[in-house]
């Protein structure tokens, strides 16, 4: 008897030793949450009950290296042949069979299975074998109690399941970089709490909607995301009144770090994630980054630090945040950008203008907190 399933393969999880079961369990939870389907843990793979549309959801789950959609069948050659014939597309000219065998007690090795199943397909269809550049590949996995046969294979996004590395606060500005940084943190096993600082004097409804759209897109990779909308107006005005123009951006970002730390403490987060890319803008020089990050008690993780803009844009397009990020809006940084900003800030020149922790605490307390995604 054949059952249509998806068979999931992972990469790094397989080398996690004693923690492997924990990582697998987290991935299974993510698959169940994303698909709503029955999931079974098999050694070295995960089996998912199939339903229409499963592929698009599975492709966005961190921790999956690739998955095949086909049939689970009984562990004998005749059943495998029948399944192989069933997974072939209607139109093709050439094919090959690719067998892997984790069950060494199966009476044939991988080469023999390839040869026998291939000969059966030739006999039944009249198609030709092409081992170099086939139109169709039939993958066969010989396991302990069953075999999996499929010709549709989909690449996942790799990485680790969300949550295995703990929780982080990710600063979301509304630009191209910060959503990509949040995604990269998710891909390394972090559960993201998103934080956006907004200025209520601007086009708040449009800004709010754009940030919500970005969070919803990111939620496709994580599941539900908690989004903090932090009112920044009072802190911003204090910085404008107190700080020389060339230092405002550095002071402003240090203030964001302190507020992010307050939220992290509340949410049980262990680090702050930023969209910084080294030397991309004035605030992202090594000197300025050192001064800005020193305001955080927690580790600050910049996943994009070594990427150029083209690399970041390519990921943004792949995860479908790019078109949202380029929607026009005024962000609260615009007030802070000086004509000649400081690129080599010194901590002693910055801290003497600070001292608005009460306003920062008040802003965090007055944050709007949204639950985004499903």
UniProtKB/Swiss-Prot annotation:
GO terms for cellular component: cytosol. PROSITE patterns: THUMP. It is an enzyme of class 2 (transferase). CDD domains: PPase_ThiI, THUMP_ThiI. Its main location: cytoplasm. It comes from the Archaea. It catalyses: [ThiI sulfur-carrier protein]-S-sulfanyl-L-cysteine + a uridine in tRNA + 2 reduced [2Fe-2S]-[ferredoxin] + ATP + H(+) = [ThiI sulfur-carrier protein]-L-cysteine + a 4-thiouridine in tRNA + 2 oxidized [2Fe-2S]-[ferredoxin] + AMP + diphosphate; [ThiS sulfur-carrier protein]-C-terminal Gly-Gly-AMP + S-sulfanyl-L-cysteinyl-[cysteine desulfurase] + AH2 = [ThiS sulfur-carrier protein]-C-terminal-Gly-aminoethanethioate + L-cysteinyl-[cysteine desulfurase] + A + AMP + 2 H(+). It is found in: Cytoplasm. Belongs to the ThiI family. Catalyzes the ATP-dependent transfer of a sulfur to tRNA to produce 4-thiouridine in position 8 of tRNAs, which functions as a near-UV photosensor. Also catalyzes the transfer of sulfur to the sulfur carrier protein ThiS, forming ThiS-thiocarboxylate. This is a step in the synthesis of thiazole, in the thiamine biosynthesis pathway. The sulfur is donated as persulfide by IscS. NCBIfam families: tRNA uracil 4-sulfurtransferase ThiI. This is Probable tRNA sulfurtransferase. It comes from Archaeoglobus fulgidus (strain ATCC 49558 / DSM 4304 / JCM 9628 / NBRC 100126 / VC-16). The lineage of its organism: Archaea, Methanobacteriati, Methanobacteriota, Archaeoglobi, Archaeoglobales. The gene is thiI.
């Amino acid at each position: 008897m054949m059952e249509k399933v998806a068979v999931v393969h992972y990469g790094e999880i397989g080398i996690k030793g004693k923690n492997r079961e924990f990582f697998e369990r987290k991935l299974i939870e993510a698959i169940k949450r994303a698909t709503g389907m029955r999931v079974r843990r098999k050694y070295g793979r995960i089996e998912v009950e199939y339903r229409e549309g499963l592929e698009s959801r599975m492709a966005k789950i961190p921790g999956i290296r690739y998955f095949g959609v086909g049939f689970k069948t009984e562990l004998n050659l005749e059943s495998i042949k029948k399944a192989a014939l069933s997974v072939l597309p209607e139109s093709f000219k050439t094919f090959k069979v690719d067998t892997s065998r984790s069950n060494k007690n199966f009476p044939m090795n991988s080469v023999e299975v390839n040869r026998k199943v291939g000969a059966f397909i030739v006999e039944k269809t009249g198609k030709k074998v092409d081992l170099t550049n086939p139109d169709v590949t039939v993958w066969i996995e010989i396991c302990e109690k069953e075999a999996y046969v499929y010709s549709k294979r989909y690449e996942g996004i790799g990485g680790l399941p969300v949550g295995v590395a703990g929780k982080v606060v990710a600063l979301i500005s509304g630009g191209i970089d910060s959503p990509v940084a949040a995604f990269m943190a998710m891909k390394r096993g972090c559960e993201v709490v998103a934080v956006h600082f907004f200025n209520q004097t601007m086009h708040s409804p449009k800004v709010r909607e754009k940030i919500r759209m970005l969070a919803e897109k990111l939620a496709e990779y994580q599941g539900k995301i908690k989004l903090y909308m932090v009112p920044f107006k009072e802190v911003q005005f204090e910085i404008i009144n107190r700080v020389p123009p060339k230092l405002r951006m550095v002071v402003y970002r240090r203030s964001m770090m302190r507020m992010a730390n307050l939220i992290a403490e509340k949410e049980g987060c262990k680090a702050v994630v930023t969209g910084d890319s080294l030397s991309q803008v004035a605030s992202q020089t090594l000197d300025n980054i050192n001064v800005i990050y020193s305001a955080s008690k927690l580790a600050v993780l910049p996943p994009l630090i070594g990427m150029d803009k083209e690399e970041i844009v390519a990921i943004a397009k792949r995860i479908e945040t790019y078109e949202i990020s380029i929607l026009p809006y005024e962000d609260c940084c615009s007030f802070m950008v000086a004509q000649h900003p400081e690129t080599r800030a010194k901590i002693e020149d910055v801290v003497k203008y600070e001292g608005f922790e009460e306003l920062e605490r008040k802003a965090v307390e007055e944050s709007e907190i949204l639950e985004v995604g499903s």
